[in-house]
Amino acid sequence: MKLLVVGASYRTAPVAALERLTVAPADLSRVLTRLVAQPYVSEAVLVSTCNRVEVYAVVSGFHGGLGDICAVLAESTGCQPAALADHLYVHFDAAAVNHVFRVAVGLDSMVVGEAQILGQLRDAYHWASEAETVGRLLHELMQQALRVGKRAHSETGIDRAGQSVVTAALGLATELLHSDLACRPALVVGAGAMGSLGVATLARLGAGPVSVTNRGVDRAIRLAESYGATAVPIADLTATLSTVDIVVAATAAPEAVLTRAVVTQALAGRNPSRGPLVLLDLAVPRDVEPGVADLPGVQVIDIDRMAALVADGPVAADAAAVEQIVAAEVDTFLTWLRGADVAPTVAALRGRADDVVAAELGRLVHRRPDLTDEQRADVARTVHRVVQRLLHQPTVRVRQLAAEPGGDQYTALLRELFDLEVPQTSAVGTVPDVVVPDVDPQLGGDAEAPPTGGE
């Protein structure tokens, strides 16, 4: 079996395309089930965040697996296959493992080193386990990815390799407002992971008063109390907009929350001498309706703009250390993978030998009914010892060869020579606990919000 990664991210697709590709939490189980129902796909994990949609799969063939995954993505998102292909990247086997580990440590994130993606990978693994679409190989891959991510954050300073997206975007907001954020009134829409980071960062930068609104009132109240902010009802959104200078929008609403009509009405009651109303849209799908950016007196900073903002940011020397960690861990995993691939084949070979021995002993019993039970047992033990000795050295050697780069050819040859049928691995139903590093809002970690991180 082979590992295949098929996905799109902020690197390959604009936010509008990612919006269409995003799989809602309620649809995850259905899409995962559809994936493993395809002829070439036996295991699947689906990662869907603001900045990436990726399928990690175990497939029986590259082209067949790629076709199956693309077909399911097109079907589940309503995207035309041709349009989908424009934004997808594909990684196979060693490159697939390398990509997943780079994602886990934050090297592939909009903000290098952000830790929030670790929690999102853990959630994706959990959802796949619940849907019974994760088996032996993806179980090991996801567990190892989580360990690698934790190791990178504990052994290096990768957390500080880049600014948080919120901090970077608010830095741009200060330029647009021609002043720092101290005492600038602000509103955070959404009380999920990204909303929490927004409130924390605004508080750290001295903005205020800060208001929080959310469809779930209790969550808004709890978040506001944590940072000395004020919770306001979602019904008061328009009125609150007219009193603030900065808005951080980070809900998981399926449609835009800050529509052109809502913002236009808010602008009518706002003093234009305070400068532009700056809207930071951190959500996918977008919280700010596209037409809002055309309104006079409004500046919209969306994910596309933030990606460009942080693309040339400084990368700490710790990133190089993390690259070394990833390279070493990829080698370790590939060695395990090659061994895992040959183990069922060796077991099948020994099983075939046992079947042959049993059949021949059965024939012996029919030919020599005069043998006593003790004699039959002696013959059986002798034959088994001979077979095991004959198989010992070849199976030890094939395990050694299989652990080397390109070793899968020896496993394939063994199957071909003895016409062995190797069953697929069974699914794993539980996700062992793996501690994910806490996200410090002052150091970043807000690059990728889970699709559930809002209302």
From Swiss-Prot:
Binding-site list for NADP(+): 190-195
One Pfam family of this chain: GlutR_dimer
One function term, GO molecular function aspect: glutamyl-tRNA reductase activity
Single GO biological process annotation from the record: protoporphyrinogen IX biosynthetic process from glutamate
Residues reported to bind substrate: 49-52, 109, 114-116, 120
InterPro entries assigned: 4pyrrol_synth_GluRdtase, 4pyrrol_synth_GluRdtase_dimer, 4pyrrol_synth_GluRdtase_N, GluRdtase_dimer_dom_sf, GluRdtase_N_sf, NAD(P)-bd_dom_sf, Shikm_DH/Glu-tRNA_Rdtase
Enzyme Commission number(s) of this protein: 1.2.1.70
Keywords, comma-separated and alphabetical: NADP, Oxidoreductase, Porphyrin biosynthesis
Enzyme class label: oxidoreductase
Catalytic activity: (S)-4-amino-5-oxopentanoate + tRNA(Glu) + NADP(+) = L-glutamyl-tRNA(Glu) + NADPH + H(+)
Disulfide-bonded cysteines: none
Site features described as Important for activity, chain residue numbers: 99
Subunit structure: Homodimer.
PANTHER family per the UniProt record, alphabetical: GLUTAMYL-TRNA REDUCTASE
Record comment regarding domains: Possesses an unusual extended V-shaped dimeric structure with each monomer consisting of three distinct domains arranged along a curved 'spinal' alpha-helix. The N-terminal catalytic domain specifically recognizes the glutamate moiety of the substrate. The second domain is the NADPH-binding domain, and the third C-terminal domain is responsible for dimerization.
Function: Catalyzes the NADPH-dependent reduction of glutamyl-tRNA(Glu) to glutamate 1-semialdehyde (GSA).
Sequence similarity: Belongs to the glutamyl-tRNA reductase family.
Name by which UniProt lists this protein: Glutamyl-tRNA reductase
Originating species: Salinispora tropica (strain ATCC BAA-916 / DSM 44818 / JCM 13857 / NBRC 105044 / CNB-440)
Gene label: hemA
